[in-house]
């Protein structure tokens, strides 16, 4: 009898929830909201994200349009999938959408938004961005690390030359190069060869790609605890803070003459030279931004560029011809040579178009109600810009939008530095990535040296997945399988 009563109560609860859900759905249809696919009770549209959300959301946008409203649990999410719609959000109404939503994972790792990429829109964010734009990633600062880039590229070339008769794990070589450059620039020394550092970075990258159920359905937050996410967050945040604190303290105890980001930020903290105070937590958060924003995404672009070139040997041949013609009898490619390499820049653009390192840009959040293309967007709406979908939009790129064809950029005005929303791998507007020049110059000079020094081919025993463009899961999307190649 008791069991029967419990079953009846459970059924009544389910019926009541379903009735309330459909009533709310009906009310929502009367408001002037963007088109939205049908939602399930409680989780709403969460089940439609799939293994690769950028692909799933792109497919949904073909049916519901470039401005599409989803609900992840209790959170309204506006998905933007076209260049015109992105212009409305990132340019026309840039200020309204300039903030960032809170996230359990990001808050725990990035010191509750003390960094630049994830800080809420406001005075603190403006101050930290000015430090990055005017100092850390200024053209002068980027040029000052030219020798670091050249030294690490020379070491990479020598390593490849020694292994020239063997199958080379190009993915591993590229990630090691990127790690070494960024560690030297940001921290003043290499850490990439240390197993504990590599493990820390792998755990960080993996965790940033996790999905926190509790961030969207608060009453299901216990699921994050059950599956170990909360424990992993505590562990990784403590390990990262311990590592960064040790690095900063080593600089404090040193002679103060290192030319790296930590030393520069400590000088600002000590001398108060920028008109506002910067503390130890802010320093650690900004350095963490450099690792997350540059390390994984930079090597990912290089990996995809070499993948596409090996898949399209006519493009590889053309790039190689250009690089060798510009450099002629030089032993290597210098950064001064890059300005004359138009096809190289086209290859970088085309790779960014088809394989933006962050297919779904870091989410934005509306701070006020706003009218967007006759749709009402309330304050507190999360906004996801699908850079992957925008880069493959046939209306912009033509019927061959899915094909790798660098030639399309040779006479094109479209650029990736924020002026044109047809190509937004680094974002646009107020929240555009401040480190574009820092990342792109490394990508260009590495790729140019790779094709200048060696003739590349796939191993004879290469299986189909070597040239497959299957993607990994996570925040930054790289190849599912490592890229192996040989030099001839």
Swiss-Prot record:
InterPro entries in UniProt: Cyt_P450 (IPR001128), Cyt_P450_CS (IPR017972), Cyt_P450_E_grp-I (IPR002401), Cyt_P450_sf (IPR036396)
Protein name per Swiss-Prot or TrEMBL: Cytochrome P450 71A24
SUPFAM superfamilies: Cytochrome P450 (SSF48264)
Source superkingdom: Eukaryota
Gene Ontology terms, MF aspect: heme binding; iron ion binding; monooxygenase activity; oxidoreductase activity, acting on paired donors, with incorporation or reduction of molecular oxygen
Species of provenance: Arabidopsis thaliana
Similarity-based family: Belongs to the cytochrome P450 family.
Cofactor: heme
One Pfam entry name: p450
